[in-house]
Regions:
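Short, charged, intrinsically disordered terminal tails
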Residues: 1-5
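Compact, glycine-rich, soluble single-domain proteins
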Residues: 6-82
Length: 82
C-alpha cells in the first residue's frame, strides 16, 4: 500500500531545520534534483549544497542546505546536512 504522505526530517549540524509532513520533496543530489513522492523506492544519496523544496497542503517551503546525506524510504525522508 502506498502511503499518502511523507514524514520529513531535515537535520542540520546543530539544530532541527524542519520536521513534519510533506506531499512532495525536491532535493539537490549528486545526480541533480531528485523529486520524492510517497511510495518512493528506498535509496541513499549524497546531498549537494542547494535548496530543498517541500510541498504540503498547497504551500511550498524552501530550505537552503549544505552537503550531507539523504535516506529515502517509501513513507519517510531523512536529510542530514553539515
Amino acid at each position: 500500500m502506498i502511503p499518502e504522505i511523507l514524514k520529513l526530517s531535515i537535520i542540520g549540524y546543530d539544530r532541527v531545520i524542519y520536521q513534519g509532513e510533506a506531499e512532495f520533496v525536491v532535493l539537490p543530489t549528486q545526480w541533480g534534483e531528485m523529486g520524492v513522492l510517497p511510495g518512493h523506492t528506498k535509496t541513499f544519496a549524497l546531498l549537494k549544497p542547494g535548496k530543498i523544496r517541500v510541498k504540503n497542503k498547497g504551500s511550498e517551503e524552501i530550505f537552503t542546505v549544505k552537503e550531507g546525506v539523504i535516506k529515502v524510504k517509501p513513507d519517510e525522508v531523512e536529510v542530514l546536512s553539515a
